[in-house]
């Protein structure tokens, strides 16, 4: 049986995912804390750490502009206390062809918002 905290954590991550798929930067940022941390998957091998809402906002603005059809599909999601793991497929058009990538995000939730989003990919 899911606990109340687990349910709240899942709800926060589901709000983030819906905001991401809407490409609305204001909605995305409404789901994140002011001191949020986002570890992106690029550049390899370790990705780029982006800290603070202002910097994360700039990242999302550039990202959605460069990836107008970006979409995440959740394959599996589970929460434990303030942590959530999402296994996903990221789809977009690349070089005029459908393209996808599989990965995992590890979220930390605080006060109903994303405080950390750590992204990892296959390949």
Language-model regions, residue ranges each:
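Short, low-complexity N-terminal intrinsically disordered segments enriched in polar/charged residues
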Residues: 1-34
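Alpha-helix C-capping/helix-to-loop hinge sites
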Residues: 16-19, 39, 92
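Hydrophobic residues in well-ordered beta-strands that form the structural core
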Residues: 29, 38-40, 116
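A short gly/proline-enriched turn/hairpin at secondary-structure junctions
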Residues: 37-50, 62-64
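A broad, structural micro-motif
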Residues: 50-51, 72
